[in-house]
Amino acid sequence: MSFVKDFKPQALGDTNLFKPIKIGNNELLHRAVIPPLTRMRALHPGNIPNRDWAVEYYTQRAQRPGTMIITEGAFISPQAGGYDNAPGVWSEEQMVEWTKIFNAIHEKKSFVWVQLWVLGWAAFPDNLARDGLRYDSASDNVFMDAEQEAKAKKANNPQHSLTKDEIKQYIKEYVQAAKNSIAAGADGVEIHSANGYLLNQFLDPHSNTRTDEYGGSIENRARFTLEVVDALVEAIGHEKVGLRLSPYGVFNSMSGGAETGIVAQYAYVAGELEKRAKAGKRLAFVHLVEPRVTNPFLTEGEGEYEGGSNDFVYSIWKGPVIRAGNFALHPEVVREEVKDKRTLIGYGRFFISNPDLVDRLEKGLPLNKYDRDTFYQMSAHGYIDYPTYEEALKLGWDKK
């Protein structure tokens, strides 16, 4: 391991990134947010947060007081899942471990929001079949890719277009998952409606070919996401709910900028959120994946969509906005983005490799390189063994 080469850090301590901001009921002391980072360390069976390492992992990254952490995506129910080593928030056994994590983050005087996750067609159909569960999506006549279609057929678990009753059941499970999270001590929840997972599959005209009230128009495609928003606001309060969107994302076979109506689709969602805000139910934040990163599996600078911007959201939605996507190596871009006083910045991959990232951003210190090979590996290595800047100096990284 070593510092990133060919990168000139810039101190950002004099920017709005280091001005306090209130998100929901939380008084953040800076605006560098840890976005959801799937790490595949949960225990199987049971999708239980890792008993040996998870508390340490989150504690390390909560070390700067006043930091907002959004957890790795957590499945709201067994049916929502399909990955053995991602955590859930439906069982007592899971919540025991989450409570330890939440307490550890709060002991560092930081804040924690749980990302609520439903996979849809991105799930492994064979895992679902093994557990007697459906392989769900918005439609059953268009597939994520040929490989997923073949896997589903081989597992005798063909892609299933959700019925209206099944949509209602998912909404109930979202509510229960949100209640479980808050009861265990979380500060709030983020609804994952981005990156090609189930709610995004309903938003996108490529994956949603329905002809009922959940498809066929901008309003109908947004219905499921907005019903989840309304149900959670009712259940736990608007100030404890945020929403993640990725208008230009192409991960998991979404349309991104290739869809001519994509801005109209997301402008409608933003408008509906602002309408609710004006009625006294403003969400804590909207979280946007930037077109700078259309696919999280690509290296920094690859797959950038240059034909559009998320700036349109600001003219509609008047609450806080978290922007995530390839910012760590571009402090000059961050300096511009945070001139807007409603903006927070999500730092993902470099929060994995730099547990003290906030200090480094403030002072303009070198950044630890990350090791992509350990992102999803069931090991403590690459999870809880990245050094702080001071530790890296003791290891002689500045001489490498």
Curated annotation (Swiss-Prot):
Keyword entries, A-Z: Flavoprotein, FMN, NADP, Oxidoreductase
UniProt cross-references to SUPFAM superfamilies, sorted A to Z: FMN-linked oxidoreductases
Record's keyword annotation contains Acetylation: no
Residue ranges the record marks as coiled coil: none
Leader sequence segment: none
The keyword Transport is assigned to this record: no
Catalytic activity: A + NADPH + H(+) = AH2 + NADP(+)
Purpose of the protein: Flavin-dependent enoate reductase that catalyzes the chemo- and stereoslective hydrogenation of electron-poor alkenes. The enzyme is reduced by NADPH, and oxygen, quinones, and alpha,beta-unsaturated aldehydes and ketones can act as electron acceptors to complete catalytic turnover. The physiological oxidant remains elusive.
Protein name as it appears in the record: NADPH dehydrogenase 1
Classification of source organism: Eukaryota, Fungi, Dikarya, Ascomycota, Saccharomycotina
